[in-house]
Amino acid sequence: MKVKPSVKPICDKCKVIRRHGRVMVICENPRHKQRQG
């Protein structure tokens, strides 16, 4: 899980979602997981 000030989809499998008011990227590739904060 990468924590970044701005999250962007890296590949076409990445999805940007909101969970508990946090913007996150979920993907098949675990290295693409990101959370804003």
Curated annotation (Swiss-Prot):
SUPFAM superfamilies: Ribosomal protein L36. It comes from the Bacteria. GO terms for molecular function: structural constituent of ribosome. Keywords: Ribonucleoprotein, Ribosomal protein. One of its GO terms (cellular component) is ribonucleoprotein complex. GO terms for biological process: translation. InterPro entries: Ribosomal_bL36 (IPR000473), Ribosomal_bL36_sp (IPR035977). Pfam families: Ribosomal_L36. HAMAP family: Ribosomal_bL36. Belongs to the bacterial ribosomal protein bL36 family. This is Large ribosomal subunit protein bL36. The gene is rpmJ.
